[in-house]
Amino acid sequence: MSRPAQLDRRGFLALAPALGAAGLLAACSRTQVGTGTPKEDVGLLAKLREQGFVKVGFAGEAPYGFQDGGELSGEAPTLHRAIFKALGVPELRPALTDFGSLIPGLLAGRFDVVSAGMSITPERCGKVIFSQPEFVSPTALMVRQGNPKRLSDFASCAREGATVGVLTAAVEASYAKAAGVPDDAVKSLAKQQDGLDALLAGRIDAFALTGISLRWLARTNQGAAVEVGSPFVPEVGGVRQWSAGGAVFRPGARDLRDAFDRELAKITGDAGRYVGLVGRFGFTAKEAPPRSLRTADLCAGKGPA
């Protein structure tokens, strides 16, 4: 999981607090009278079908949404391509954007969907609307090959007296401590590669991060004598710590979002199809969101029932 202050996929950048008078007038001119809905969002799906493409914003963050040899790739674009094709929109046209500019760019109409694996948070739900979850990001442990201490979760780390590496200021430190790992056995590291290097050097016994990120780290360090364990969902105070991401739409594009959700459910509800689409990016059936995990609950700051 990423550091709270970092502007990456899971960070949050608030929009500018106020608009000038000219901006307000421009915004009014773009809305449907009596609804507050941007004009271009009325019948948006029909428009996309007619033009044959949808503009998507992405931030160039692997494995969620990035360019590979000039082609748009990653978890989100792959899912979204399949969904929009089913909706009669055969092409995704990418717009590479700084992560912090994705929501402002969406609201300004520079693209119609954010395809970046953006986490669903209450703060963002106050600005935009999300699809149902596309994935969850359970935690995992990277250990030395063979897993000599048989570590599987934070409780096993506490039991075995293991030293756990985490990213500086990341939430995994609090998860480990909540499971009983002593403060002096939790070691902070500046970046992901530092975690793998510390593990290989024997300075830590496990490196804790999301399973998705750890599998990608292992993939980009092929030949390293490490392995990534099965993902698990930590608990703090009896509350399971989920992190879920989805597609992002303007508030007026509910019809498009709802159509998107109907196709998304066909994929996330079929583990074989889900892994067949996004498995090459490090996603497994355990990253498929449970049926009980709903965007409305995540927007309210709650987990699944």
Regions picked out by a protein language model, each given a short descriptive name:
Residues 171-186, 259-305:
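Ligand-binding clefts/hinges and TM-proximal coupling segments of bilobed small-molecule sensing domains
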Residues 36-117, 126:
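Extracytoplasmic small-molecule ligand-binding "clamshell" domains
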Residues 85-86, 93-96, 100-114, 127-129, ...:
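Short helices/loops that flank or line small-molecule/ion binding pockets
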Residues 132, 145-163:
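Flexible hinge/capping segments at coil-to-helix
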